[in-house]
Design a protein with these regions (language model features):
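Short, solvent-exposed segments of well-ordered alpha helices
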Residues: 50-57, 76, 80
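Short amphipathic alpha-helical heptad-repeat segments
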Residues: 59-63
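Amphipathic, alpha-helical segments enriched in basic
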Residues: 38-45, 64, 88, 92
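Conserved small/polar residues in nucleotide/adenosyl-binding loops
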Residues: 116-117
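Short, charge-rich amphipathic alpha-helical segments embedded
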Residues: 79, 83-110
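Hydrophobic/aromatic side-chain positions at a characteristic register within alpha-helices
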Residues: 67, 71-74, 81
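Long, non-catalytic architectural segments outside compact domain cores
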Residues: 1-55
Length: 117
């Protein structure tokens, strides 16, 4: 963990800590992986807390990684593995766009997220 406890992942940044905790709450259902969340948070802490672009970029990066693993598994006929990775990718995209304010950028994320990254 970057510098806080399991609950207060980003000391002094309640929004990021709370959003991370909400995401971690999905772990018992296989919707996220704690190790992946920890890696995201380590990268965020290294970039400096509070930058909403960093938040989106780091969560999106992990989502894209899972999406690529899902695509690969699907091609190989490993449907359960693919579905696990697609589920995690979706939750990471969802978590990443959490702090993008309403407007053109958020709309672009929904239309074509790759144009925003």
């Amino acid at each position: 963990m970057p510098g806080g406890t399991w609950i207060d992942h980003f000391p002094g940044n309640f929004m990021w800590s709370n959003a991370t905790l909400v995401c971690k709450g999905m772990a018992p259902y296989g919707a996220v992986a704690i190790g992946e969340i920890d890696r995201i948070c380590e990268r965020l802490a290294a970039r400096g807390m509070g930058d909403p672009d960093a938040w989106w970029q780091e969560w999106c990066s992990m989502a894209e990684r899972n999406e690529a693993l899902a695509d690969e598994a699907a091609v190989d006929g490993r449907e359960f593995t693919a579905s696990d990775h697609y589920l995690r990718a979706g939750n990471y995209y969802y978590t990443g766009e959490r702090f993008v304010p309403p407007g053109e950028k958020k709309l672009a994320i929904y239309i074509d997220r790759k144009s925003v990254v």
